[in-house]
Amino acid sequence: MIKVENLTKVFHTDEVETHALNGVSLEVQDGEFVAVMGPSGCGKSTLLNILGLLDNPTSGHYSLDGHEVGGLRERERTLFRRGRIGFVFQSFNLIDELNVEENVELPLKALGVPAKERRQRVVEILRQLKMSHRAHHYPQQLSGGQQQRVAIARAVVTKPSLLLA
């Protein structure tokens, strides 16, 4: 599913060159669970941003589901990412103006899933995560743990092949 070879990421600012990733190689098969651990500033978020197609590597190869994706332009990355990759962000990234149900439904709308199917999927995932009773609440009305469950629901409602958290 994921194959990364000699991945590097270099950030340039004025006079400073920062090597966030240097020669990272890994392979993750379908169904495997992998934890990336390390101290602050070691490149974990940079790696996840590249794996999630939010950024490109400076060099190296990255293939996802057999497709070389490491050098895709932003629009191509967005189209490839939709429906294939689910994210649970550290800060949840819920939209304050949308209730729980609407937040979870959002990625399905972006994929063009018909309204009836969207409704069924949202109801089911909220039931599974024991959040049905909060469907019409807004993020600011939820505890941190409840917000995290909504973020998880939104990440998995599209049935992605890759989940990054």
Say what each PLM segment does:
Residues 1-165:
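ABC family nucleotide-binding domain
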